[in-house]
């Protein structure tokens, strides 16, 4: 099986608003929209939108046993693990186990994430 496919559409357009889902436990802070997923491997591409003023400090830092790539689409996000503001255009290819977060944003932020949960080391 391969990742799901879609024709051109704009997930950031107001008409697509109803497709975004609150992230469990972070309903007032962030929401997500899965763009594509491979049901066999679990590989997925999704957008995460952090609302203006969001602060995930209470959730602590994160790491995964698999690699992921992130790209800041809009806004800015502070990654406390790196003591760095990530702004529109920033990109990272994270290896398995890399610690990131917690995050906070003053103006809001949209992050494109491509994850490979089947590629654990």
Can you name each region flagged by the protein language model?
Residues 1-44:
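A short, N-terminal "cap"/entry segment at the start of jelly-roll beta-barrel domains
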Residues 28, 96-121:
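Ligand-binding loop in jelly-roll beta-barrel domains
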Residues 33-64, 83, 95-99:
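Conserved short histidine dyad/triad with adjacent acidic residue
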Residues 43, 68, 107:
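Conserved catalytic motifs of the protein kinase core domain
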Residues 48-50, 71-77, 112:
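Short, well-ordered beta-strand segments in beta-rich or mixed alpha/beta enzyme
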Residues 58-80:
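Glycine- and acidic-residue-biased ligand/ion/polar-headgroup-sensing regions
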């Amino acid at each position: 099986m391969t990742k799901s496919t879609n024709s051109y559409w704009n997930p950031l357009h107001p008409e697509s608003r109803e497709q975004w889902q609150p992230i469990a436990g972070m309903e007032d802070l962030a929401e997500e929209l899965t763009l594509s997923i491979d049901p066999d491997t679990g590989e997925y591409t999704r957008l995460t939108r952090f609302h203006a003023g969001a602060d995930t400090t209470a959730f602590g830092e994160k790491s995964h046993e698999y690699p992921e790539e992130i790209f800041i689409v809009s806004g800015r996000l502070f990654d406390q693990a790196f003591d760095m503001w990530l702004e529109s255009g920033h990109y990272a290819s994270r290896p398995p186990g890399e610690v990131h977060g917690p995050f906070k944003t003053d103006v809001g932020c949209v992050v494109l994430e491509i994850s490979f949960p089947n590629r654990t080391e």
